[in-house]
């Protein structure tokens, strides 16, 4: 379950010893944490307008950056306050986790639909999935974890660095596809034992 800043992917893979067989994969290249940030910025706008009767510019990166800060805080706290500068001066705005989760529910539902598509395409069901791995910074959002746990009937596995997993995977994949002369003999031997079969993640068109 890979939910990053701008994309979402879900993959079912079978791992035996050091062989990784990708069975099915689905994704949405326009769904990610940036959508969560925008929804928080919309909450800023709603509350600012209520008090000042004027709107803030949601295209301004300042509000998106402030929204991202709020998102990170709400991953560990139930609510937070943020000072927001608007057309009619600064305003302290309070955002609760409950408000945030309600605002992003549509996006979480989209990820659930893609999981169900992957399950159907592979002929699998949640009971046959041994482990659920999270990748991508947006998987820190409690509502995401809660939704996934409920759907799969088990909590995701902890211990994987959600920020570094993609980079590590890409490095291994590149090593499998090319001859990397910077590797020492021990690293080359370890890499030679890894076998990966992959599928195309997205429809490529005709």
Task: Locate the predicted segments by residue.
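Oxyanion-binding/catalytic loops of NTP- or PPi-dependent enzymes
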Residues: 1-206
């Amino acid at each position: 379950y890979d939910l990053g800043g701008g994309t979402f992917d879900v993959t079912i893979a079978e791992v035996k010893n050091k062989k990784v067989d990708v069975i099915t994969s689905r994704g949405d290249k326009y769904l990610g944490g940036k959508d969560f940030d925008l929804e928080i910025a919309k909450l800023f706008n709603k509350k600012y307008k209520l008090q000042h009767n004027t709107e803030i510019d949601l295209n301004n990166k300042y509000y998106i950056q402030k929204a991202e800060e709020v998102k990170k805080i709400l991953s560990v706290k139930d609510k937070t306050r943020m000072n927001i500068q608007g057309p009619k001066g600064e305003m302290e705005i309070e955002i609760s986790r409950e408000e945030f989760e309600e605002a992003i529910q549509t996006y979480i539902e989209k990820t659930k639909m893609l999981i169900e598509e992957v399950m159907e395409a592979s002929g699998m069901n949640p009971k046959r999935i041994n482990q659920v791995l999270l990748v991508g910074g947006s998987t820190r959002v409690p509502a995401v974890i809660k939704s996934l746990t409920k759907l799969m009937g088990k909590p995701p596995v902890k211990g994987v660095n959600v920020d570094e997993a993609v980079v590590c995977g890409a490095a291994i994949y590149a090593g499998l596809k090319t001859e990397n002369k910077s590797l020492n003999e021990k690293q080359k031997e370890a890499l030679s034992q890894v076998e990966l079969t992959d599928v195309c993640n997205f429809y490529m068109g005709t």
